[in-house]
């Protein structure tokens, strides 16, 4: 598997935003159409204890969503569905050429699986792409309240604005260094202060 730097993943997602004139909360299914990808629902068995939410069939230019988990995928205006489709667009953008050239093997025949919680590097790349696509850094920065801020309501409001679930929003904010959680697991603006750092420069 080829290593893809996170900044490259962010840049590829930003290119899609620019090329397709996307806005916050955009219609992921319309984006699939514009990318020339189809979408179907079909029953897919979970694998090895992992919940399979979706698949990409790159040779058929087709995204498959698992109808066995339709209730979960469609909760809260389909937020997990949006994230799963973003994940499959990530596979298409990052991995489809390598698959077609034979330099990247598929996980199962001619399908790439989207397993919930998978730590496979290829899956992690697609996960990072989905986060960058649905919560682009520049748009998220402009939506943040000025620091300092504290509490879950800020994270919930941003999740509602970007049509994603709260957990991926919190992870995205933490990864960008715009939020950390205190000892009570409460979101707080900014990066966490390293233990003892407060005492380095006493007032």
What name fits each language-model region?
Residues 1-203:
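Active-site hotspot residues in diverse enzymes, especially metal/ion-binding acidic/histidine motifs
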């Amino acid at each position: 598997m080829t290593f893809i730097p996170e900044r490259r993943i962010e840049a590829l997602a930003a290119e899609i935003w620019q090329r397709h004139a996307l806005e916050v909360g955009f219609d992921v299914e319309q984006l699939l159409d514009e990318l020339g990808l189809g979408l179907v629902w079909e029953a897919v068995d979970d694998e090895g204890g992992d919940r399979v939410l979706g698949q990409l069939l790159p040779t058929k230019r087709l995204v498959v969503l698992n109808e066995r988990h339709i209730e979960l995928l469609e909760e809260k205006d389909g937020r997990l569905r949006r994230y799963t489709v973003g994940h499959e667009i990530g596979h298409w953008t990052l991995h489809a050429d390598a698959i077609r050239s034979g330099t990247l093997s598929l996980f199962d025949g001619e399908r790439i699986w989207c397993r919930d919680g998978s730590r496979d590097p290829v899956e992690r790349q697609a996960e990072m792409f989905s986060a960058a696509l649905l919560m682009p850094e520049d748009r998220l920065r402009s939506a943040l309240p000025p620091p300092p801020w504290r509490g879950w309501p800020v994270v919930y409001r941003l999740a509602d604005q970007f049509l994603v679930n709260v957990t991926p929003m919190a992870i995205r904010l933490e990864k960008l260094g715009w939020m950390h959680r205190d000892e009570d697991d409460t979101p707080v603006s900014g990066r966490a202060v390293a233990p003892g750092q407060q005492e380095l420069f006493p007032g």
